[in-house]
């Protein structure tokens, strides 16, 4: 009677004791307070749907091909694909931990059987099953962390592609700007060379002082040196682009020689609400998923401190052959149902829980910092874009005015009404204004590229959630 009461007591109290061990993981979502509106002006007349492949609007088919080629050979994209595969494998392993495991065993031997007192051949085969019953959700929390990190890895794959597209677009814009400035430098060198030639003829005829002719020759030499330096910079940019894309350099130079249409003034638009743009940033999404994964790992670490329940079983068959007689044996078992209760581990489990909590705090801090950084990057790109728009008309007017002034001064110099010093001064200002206009056009395109990258490159968080299925992730990795 006493034994029966004891069994009843433990059977009643054990579920209550287990249920009392509640696991309280930190929140999977960390609240943030992005600004309600952008402080910098937004670009107008662009389309929100044009962000994903905005570079197709530039009228530069070469850029489209270069970006596709760079994304195909980029080590960053390949690394992101590898991390998706790693995260997928971790997810499969974490889900498998929730299921029973089944192992097959087989063996055969021949020797002296003590029970039969003779030589016998023994063979046996069986199946061994085991299952850890996830009482406190440790394995479920591990699976949740794996799911979150897989979603984050998929987002980072898109970010890698966005980074490559932005880098190639920036490098191509820099190269085309360099080539435009090279044309300006070569025209200037040709003009100064002609001035030096005419000054030399005038000097030999006795109409120009030797010092003035020397100034013209020095100016021509300076222009040649500047053109040579500019050509070197362009060659360096070409080789950088070759390394990014894997193109052959002769083919790239041939394509660069073809004329390209001027880029439109407005390429795309972004959402008016900062929260909407933040939702399209893959790095912000990954940081958010890392917080959720760290939260799940805290729950898993806490669950390791509580009892664990496992169930095992087996089924098998054996046969023994001795002296021409074969004996068959079949066995099966269910159990034991084993309960493991941690009593003392020197504080190891508590320390692991504290470490998981510290990682969660770190992930939450990094997530908030990532949100602030994303807002700052968008704001900075908008400011640069607005600044280039405001300066464009003035820079164009200045370049046209200084060019007209130089043409007039050159005509006066040819007629003997202006000195060579006046001509060179007008030339310097015209050259500086023309180079400034070319640089401003590059700066504006660079601002568009920075805004494209800061706005997430057209990524969609809802699409990322849908891509959490194995088939979708495999398709994306390809």
Predicted features along the sequence, with ranges:
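Transmembrane beta-barrel architecture of outer-membrane proteins
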Residues: 63-65, 122-124, 170, 215, ...
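Short loop-to-helix capping motifs
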Residues: 60, 73-76, 132, 179, ...
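Periplasmic alpha-helical coiled-coil/stalk elements that build and connect Gram-negative outer-membrane
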Residues: 139, 155-273, 384, 388, ...
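Membrane-embedded beta-strand positions in outer-membrane beta-barrel channels/transporters
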Residues: 67, 124-128, 172, 274, ...
């Amino acid at each position: 009677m006493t034994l029966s009461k004891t069994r009843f007591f433990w059977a009643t109290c054990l579920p209550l004791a287990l249920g009392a061990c509640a696991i309280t993981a930190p929140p999977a979502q960390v609240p943030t307070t992005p600004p309600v509106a952008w402080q910098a002006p937004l670009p107008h007349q662009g389309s929100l749907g044009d962000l994903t492949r905005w570079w197709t609007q530039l009228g530069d088919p070469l850029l489209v091909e270069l970006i596709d080629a760079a994304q195909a050979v980029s080590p960053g994209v390949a690394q992101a694909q590898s991390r998706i595969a790693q995260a997928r494998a971790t997810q499969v392993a974490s889900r498998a931990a929730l299921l029973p495991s089944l192992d097959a065993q087989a063996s055969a031997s021949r020797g002296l059987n003590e029970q039969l007192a003779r030589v016998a051949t023994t063979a046996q085969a069986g199946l061994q099953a085991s299952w850890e019953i996830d009482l406190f959700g440790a394995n479920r929390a591990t699976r949740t962390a794996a799911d979150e990190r897989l979603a984050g890895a998929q987002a980072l794959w898109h970010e890698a592609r966005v980074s490559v597209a932005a880098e190639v677009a920036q490098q191509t814009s820099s190269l085309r700007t360099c080539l435009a400035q090279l044309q300006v430098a070569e025209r200037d060198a040709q003009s100064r060379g002609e001035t030096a030639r005419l000054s030399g003829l005038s000097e030999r005829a006795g109409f120009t002082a030797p010092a003035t002719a020397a100034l013209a020759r020095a100016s021509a030499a300076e222009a040649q040196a500047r053109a040579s330096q500019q050509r070197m910079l362009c060659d360096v940019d070409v080789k950088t682009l070759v390394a990014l894309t894997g193109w052959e350099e002769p083919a790239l130079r041939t394509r660069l020689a073809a004329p390209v249409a001027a880029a439109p003034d407005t390429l795309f638009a972004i959402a008016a609400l900062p929260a909407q743009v933040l939702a399209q940033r893959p790095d912000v999404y990954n940081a958010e998923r890392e917080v959720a994964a760290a939260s799940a790992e805290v729950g898993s670490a806490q669950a390791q401190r509580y009892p664990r329940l496992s169930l095992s079983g087996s089924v098998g068959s054996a046969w023994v052959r001795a002296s021409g007689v074969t004996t068959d044996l079949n066995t099966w078992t269910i159990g034991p149902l084993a309960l493991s209760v941690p009593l003392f581990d020197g504080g190891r489990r508590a320390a692991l829980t504290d470490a998981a909590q510290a990682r969660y705090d770190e992930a939450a801090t990094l997530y908030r910092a990532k949100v602030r950084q994303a807002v700052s990057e968008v704001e900075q790109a908008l400011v640069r874009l607005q600044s280039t728009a405001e300066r464009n008309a003035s820079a164009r007017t200045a370049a046209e005015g200084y060019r007209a002034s130089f043409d007039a001064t050159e005509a006066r110099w040819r007629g003997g009404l202006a000195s060579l010093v006046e001509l060179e001064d007008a030339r310097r200002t015209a050259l500086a204004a023309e180079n400034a206009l070319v640089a401003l056009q590059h700066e504006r395109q660079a601002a568009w590229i920075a805004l494209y990258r800061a706005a997430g490159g057209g990524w969609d968080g809802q699409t990322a959630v849908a891509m959490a299925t194995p088939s979708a992730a495999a398709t994306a990795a390809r």
